[in-house]
UniProtKB/Swiss-Prot annotation:
HAMAP family: Exonuc_7_S
Species this chain originates from: Halorhodospira halophila (strain DSM 244 / SL1) (Ectothiorhodospira halophila (strain DSM 244 / SL1))
Primary role: Bidirectionally degrades single-stranded DNA into large acid-insoluble oligonucleotides, which are then degraded further into small acid-soluble oligonucleotides.
Entry keywords, A to Z: Cytoplasm, Exonuclease, Hydrolase, Nuclease
Quaternary data: Heterooligomer composed of large and small subunits.
Cystines in this chain: none
GO CC, alphabetical: cytosol; exodeoxyribonuclease VII complex
Family, similarity comment: Belongs to the XseB family.
This enzyme's EC code(s): 3.1.11.6
Subcellular location: Cytoplasm
Major subcellular site: cytoplasm
UniProt-listed InterPro entries: Exonuc_VII_S, Exonuc_VII_ssu_sf
Lineage of source species: Bacteria, Pseudomonadati, Pseudomonadota, Gammaproteobacteria, Chromatiales
Gene: xseB
Full protein name: Exodeoxyribonuclease 7 small subunit
Length: 87
């Protein structure tokens, strides 16, 4: 296994931020789809993928809750479309 591969599959207790988790999941999927892994490597990557997926799901749920709270606490509850040019 290359150094890059070992960095992409960090220990299960080391859960990175959402964006890095998604990137690691994509790398795991690509590696598994190539079908060049041993059974042990594939199982290890699958297990890591499950942990990363759960981490991402929790992060998304937390973000959804924050958005819901922010919308609840807004003055009129109505949020207009995003316009990046508005200052």
């Amino acid at each position: 296994m290359s150094e890059t591969d070992s960095q992409e599959t960090a220990p299960q207790g080391d859960l990175p931020d959402f964006e890095r988790s998604v990137a690691e999941l994509e790398a795991l999927i690509e590696r598994m789809e190539r079908g060049e892994q041993t059974l042990e490597e594939a199982l290890r990557d699958f297990e890591r993928g499950i942990h990363l997926t759960r981490h991402c799901q929790k992060a998304l749920s937390a973000a959804e809750q924050k958005v819901a709270i922010l919308l609840e606490n807004s003055e009129d509850g109505d949020v207009g479309p995003f316009r990046p040019d508005d200052s």
